[in-house]
């Protein structure tokens, strides 16, 4: 009887177990301001502070579409260094969501920064449903996305690495334009890098169609070849400019 009373007292005085709160996933989208533009103050701050210092050691010059239109679109950029994210950013005062490999999010410092500027983590093979849905969400909210379709930094002598699936499929599904950002050559210290920015293109002939993997590969290759062509066009432009100077 005494034991039963003790057990009853213990049950009454026992503190209820605290339920573990689930960590709420941070909202990936950015609200539009009064002018209807999606601005990331932190990204603008980084551009204002970091870009001038970066330009001193690795100067660059923009060619082509220096001021990209407001609204949803996908930047497609080739990839040499971690600082390549700078080049699309300087073409707009709106925010950009960068699609980055998951490993970058685990890197101390870099991972914190990517999360703070609303980066999207993805597997390198492009088969990441959650990442793709986040991309859709941002574009449908009227925001910009940047994809490096080579999937990794180009450390080879090749003009352009093969493109992974992603950029074309997302642009077609969301019916948004693509803007190419071509880094003409690998950025080097104290040598000017040429950055060529295209006018927006739309893959309207594929809108509303369900494409096979093979068809998407063909469209991805079309994007890749266009960037290679942009490099050749710029080479011709520089050569003609040089000839005029020698006359």
Which residue stretches match the model-derived regions?
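Non-catalytic C-terminal accessory region of glycerolipid acyltransferases
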Residues: 2-38, 132-247
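A transmembrane-helix-recognition feature enriched in membrane-embedded lipid enzymes
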Residues: 25-67, 87, 108-117
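Short, basic, glycine/proline-bearing loop/turn elements
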Residues: 49-50, 116-122, 152-155
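A generic local structural motif
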Residues: 59-64, 83-85, 132-134, 165-167
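Hydrophobic residues at beta-strand termini and immediately following loops
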Residues: 62, 99, 120-122, 181, ...
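Short polar/acidic secondary-structure junctions
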Residues: 67, 80, 185-187
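Catalytic core of membrane glycerolipid acyltransferases/transacylases, capturing the structured
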Residues: 69-126, 134
């Amino acid at each position: 009887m005494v034991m039963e009373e003790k057990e009853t007292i213990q049950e009454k005085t026992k503190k209820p177990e605290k339920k573990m709160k689930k960590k709420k996933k941070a909202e990936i989208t950015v609200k539009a301001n009064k002018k209807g533009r999606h601005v990331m103050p932190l990204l603008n701050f980084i551009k204002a502070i970091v870009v001038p210092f970066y330009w001193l050691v690795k100067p660059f010059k923009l060619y082509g579409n220096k001021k990209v239109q407001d609204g949803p679109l996908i930047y497609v950029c080739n990839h040499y260094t971690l600082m390549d994210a700078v080049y699309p950013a300087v073409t707009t005062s709106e925010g950009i969501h960068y699609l980055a490999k998951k490993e970058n999010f685990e890197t101390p410092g870099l991972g914190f920064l990517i999360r703070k500027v609303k980066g999207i983590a993805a597997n390198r093979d492009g088969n990441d449903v959650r990442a793709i849905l986040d991309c859709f969400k941002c574009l449908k909210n009227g925001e910009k996305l940047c994809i490096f379709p080579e999937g990794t930094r180009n450390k080879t002598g090749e003009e352009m690495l093969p493109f992974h699936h992603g950029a074309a499929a997302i642009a077609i599904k969301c019916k948004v334009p693509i803007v190419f950002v071509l880094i003409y050559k690998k950025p080097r210290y104290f040598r000017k890098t040429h950055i060529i920015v295209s006018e927006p293109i739309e893959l309207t002939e594929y809108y509303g169609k369900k494409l096979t993997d093979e068809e998407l590969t063909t469209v991805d290759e079309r994007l890749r070849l266009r960037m290679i062509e942009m490099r050749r066009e710029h080479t011709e432009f520089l050569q003609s400019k040089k000839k005029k100077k020698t006359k």
